[in-house]
């Protein structure tokens, strides 16, 4: 985000997705859905319709699974194929699958064209009284994970599915990558997005590729593509490229403030953030209310190159009012007058961009 040069408009949004490698999709919309929030932080003129145009019209991004549901660059499509094959071979997506129902849903979409889950709401005599919406939604998700269906577009936030042959551009590379290619892709994506990374960060949720990632890291170091880095007072070994390290060493702080989504790529690996920035963060909407320290949906505050605090927002969409329920700064951080000016300016921009105005319910707390 510091000194980002992604340009503007829809093409700028595509560059962000390609640079980060994925943008997580999330249903929570306390202030803004995660995918829009993440892009807005890197592209100040971002408009929410950009993503659907890139997905539906330009076909330069697609929806699939990274570590979670995500938008991914179409140029990386082939790297989704090993996971899809895993599902074809029998893995179920969070639930037991019904192969008869899967075939019925797939046949309908082949015959009728793109459909949403709501198109399967009513009971069908052809399948008997056991057929209802929830099993059909599971079938859609299973077929999606297998790669037989793709999300052709979104209507509101609802997925519209079609068979892959009608969605995927013919020019896209559909060759299945080897383990070595997949490992190299994950390594290069992580370094490009983060500047420097640990082996365990790259292998996160990739148990079948741990050995391949370890071997490919060594190969890339030996070839000179990567260099090993030791961070002062840290035992871990990090990896970067010579070019990235030059950028990191010459990067100037921008004097900007960013309010990050809890699912932003910069914050999603909590242990990395704690280790490098000494910022202990978790989203507390999944924590029982009595045990929350910072609020239901606290957002990290990034100032220059430091995480300096967090605040818990709430949007009243009926009255177009944006509230700060709690505001906490990190121990040792004392806001200057300049910071307060920048914070208020950013808060106004953020709130007006989403909800027109803001109010503050509590004063800052120092922790």
Predicted region positions:
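Long, charged, low-complexity, helical-prone intrinsically disordered regions
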Residues: 1-367
